[in-house]
Amino acid sequence: MVIIMDEKAKLMRCIIERILDEYNKGKTLDKKRIEQIKAECLRIHRIGIGHPSNSEILQYATEEEKKILIPILRKKPVRTISGVAVVAVMTSPEKCPHGKCIFCPGGVGSVFGDVPQSYTGREPATMRGLMFNFDPYLQTKARIEQLEKVGHPTNKIELIIMGGTFPARDIEYQDWFIKRCLDAMNGVDASSLEEAQKINETAEHRCVALCIETRPDYCGEKEINQMLKLGATRVELGVQTIYNEILEFCKRGHTVEDTIKATQLLKDSGLKVSYHLMPGMPGSDMEMDKKMFKEIFENPDFKPDMVKIYPCLVIEGTELYEMWKRGEYKPYREEEAIEIISYAKSIMPKWVRTSRIQRDIPATVIVDGVKKSNLGELVYKYMEKHGIKCKCIRCREVGHVMYKKGIMPDIEHIKLCREEYEASGGTEIFLSYEDVKNDILIAFLRLREPYKPFRKEIDDNTMLVRQLHVCGQEKPLTKDLKEITWQHKGYGRKLLEEAERIAKEEFGKKKILVTSGIGVREYYRKLGYERVGAYMGKYLE
């Protein structure tokens, strides 16, 4: 039987064969060269269409060809370069429990319509939420399909719940929302949240991390118990600043003391803590903001594991917008924001990760303030120009260093490193495997001796593993794709063994508990761990 290809198929096959030919010859296939190949094939096959997208090209490739093509054509490798595929899902609009901050643009009945609190409806995740009427199942399913179309592995998913103070919602809504996200990953409608979690432990798309956003005053024992029940591994706190007078003026509805207490409770429950920080709030200035960052990284009451930094912006429909119109407030200029954030980066400890710089708000809705969405890139350029180095996790992760700088780790110089510090009344030990010659981070583990835990699983004989992460491009759980990856090479197991040794020999503990993502529980079972309440645990003999 003779198969006759249409003209579009001929074009796609031409592009695929050219790429594979150059790949086999060892030629460089960057984004520019791929576009050149598309143009060359379009000149041969004149069919009146523009440059085909990479996802279109992949549809015409065989399964064997895809193994080579996907790593080459993958758009935005940074989406999975830290080791997981991020899926952000937006909750439905709901009024904030405390009222409205003076800089908050969104919410029910805002100038942007009914959108989630603190969003404008123009952010990618919010638009996806609106498109699917904030249905968690449809949002999750669509995002996974979107990531797969552009070549990202989606075996390991970090699920981020956005849209406001999730713990303030009804318990029934919270349980239903997470269950439906898991149903979308599992491809099966479970009868309960617990069943959905159990299925996900061995599903094709596993939830290896679950992040929930909340406020410091909605992060007490009750809220933490619920978040752990849902399967949370990280909590993002809307801290904004550590000055009470500014928090009060901006109508935040919480205090610095709330932040300190929430931070301690979260760490003593084995959860990772991320701070959202907003330099340039009304009443602050550059000197105060620099002091804030120094205090946050040095004062044991704070010391978060991660930070998101976004300068205060003026957006229509806010109380801050009216102040700005009256000349009572002026946000940071671009160069001021760059200087402040560069300073923050310069003093970050090696155990902190910068997860985001700048909100995902389009410039078209920003009335005044930093409008550039690539503020992070501008910060890095400024730092490079002024010889400023950052030691944070993101800047040293193997995936980012290889992708951004083209530097491969030297295996001979990969060593086990240890940094110990006091935080929130307890002792933190940051263990890592690093290329000490090139300052590249391969894998790390956060071990904690708790201060005042309230969970019944955690007693005086317990140490907590709050995070275990191997950096680098996500490696599928199947072993099909032959890519350069640092996952599945035993670094995680070695770090866990060292954590067990430290807990037993140095601290005299008899038990170790790991805050495991739902989809990572099987990994820990293979290492001798079993379910202990919300955790995976092991008794140290």
From Swiss-Prot:
InterPro entries: Acyl_CoA_acyltransferase (IPR016181), Aldolase_TIM (IPR013785), ELP3 (IPR039661), ELP3-like (IPR034687), ELP3-like_N (IPR056591), Elp3/MiaA/NifB-like_rSAM (IPR006638), GNAT_dom (IPR000182), Radical_SAM_C (IPR032432). It comes from Methanocaldococcus jannaschii (strain ATCC 43067 / DSM 2661 / JAL-1 / JCM 10045 / NBRC 100440). Its EC number is 2.3.1.311. Its cofactor is [4Fe-4S] cluster. The lineage of its organism: Archaea, Methanobacteriati, Methanobacteriota, Methanomada group, Methanococci. Residues 79-350 form the Radical SAM core domain. Residues 401-541 form the N-acetyltransferase domain. Pathway: tRNA modification. One of its GO terms (molecular function) is tRNA uridine(34) acetyltransferase activity. Binds 1 [4Fe-4S] cluster. The cluster is coordinated with 3 cysteines and an exchangeable S-adenosyl-L-methionine. Residues 76-336 are annotated as: Radical S-adenosyl-L-methionine (rSAM). It catalyses: uridine(34) in tRNA + acetyl-CoA + S-adenosyl-L-methionine + H2O = 5-(carboxymethyl)uridine(34) in tRNA + 5'-deoxyadenosine + L-methionine + CoA + 2 H(+). One of its GO terms (biological process) is tRNA wobble base 5-methoxycarbonylmethyl-2-thiouridinylation. Gene3D superfamilies: 3.40.630.30, Aldolase class I. It comes from the Archaea. This is tRNA uridine(34) acetyltransferase. The keyword Iron applies. GO terms for cellular component: cytoplasm. Belongs to the ELP3 family. Acetyl-CoA binds at residues 156, 467-470, 491-493, 524. [4Fe-4S] cluster binds at residues 96, 101, 104. tRNA uridine(34) acetyltransferase, which mediates formation of carboxymethyluridine in the wobble base at position 34 in tRNAs. The proposed mechanism is the following: (i) recruits S-adenosyl-L-methionine and cleaves it to generate a 5'-deoxyadenosine radical (5'-dA) in the radical S-adenosyl-L-methionine (rSAM) region, (ii) hydrolyzes acetyl-CoA in the N-acetyltransferase domain and (iii) an acetyl radical is formed by the products of the two domains and (iv) is transferred onto the C5 position of uridine(34) in the bound tRNA molecule. Keywords: 4Fe-4S, Acyltransferase, Iron, Iron-sulfur, Metal-binding, RNA-binding, S-adenosyl-L-methionine, Transferase, tRNA processing, tRNA-binding. SUPFAM superfamilies: Acyl-CoA N-acyltransferases (Nat), Radical SAM enzymes. The keyword 4Fe-4S applies.
